[in-house]
A protein has these predicted regions:
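Alpha-helix boundary/capping and short turn/kink residues
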Residues: 35, 50, 62-65, 81
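Short, contiguous, helix-prone interaction/anchoring segments in small proteins
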Residues: 38-53, 59
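Structural detector for internal amphipathic alpha-helices that build alpha-solenoid repeat scaffolds
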Residues: 10-32, 54-64, 74, 85-102
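Short coil turns that connect the paired helices of HEAT/ARM alpha-solenoid repeats
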Residues: 15, 45-51, 76-82, 113-116
Length: 116
């Protein structure tokens, strides 16, 4: 399923198609990812181009699990303002109660870095 997901977020789609169809397909892919697929996504996402990272962040807005929050926090470590804004917007409704105490601490540290 990860390969199909990557085809969509890396695809050369119009904005209309992305926001009308592909975004929802990608959200559905993510909601059915195994732990292994999430781990692979985390290891691969830094190599995605900015547009693909923005699309990933957009998809994660409605995927509430510990992996989605972790990915969004990692992606906030960017110089690209569009990606940063998308991550912050997606984090707005994140369920931080899904994280362990240590993961919450790491989120706090990373959030402080973003604000500096």
């Amino acid at each position: 399923m990860l390969n199909e997901f990557e085809e969509y977020i890396k695809g050369n789609f119009s904005d209309d198609y992305w926001y009308d169809d592909a975004l929802f397909l990608c959200e559905d892919f993510l909601k059915h990812f195994s732990d292994l697929e999430w781990t692979l996504l985390i290891s691969k996402m830094q190599n995605y181009d900015i547009q693909s990272q923005v699309r990933l962040a957009e998809c994660l807005a409605d995927v509430n699990n510990k992996y989605s929050v972790k990915i969004l926090i990692i992606l906030t470590q960017t110089e690209n303002s569009n990606l940063l804004i998308t991550c912050i917007d997606s984090l707005r409704d994140a369920n931080f109660s899904l994280l362990t105490v240590e993961e919450k601490h790491n989120v706090s540290i990373n959030a402080k870095k973003v604000l500096i």
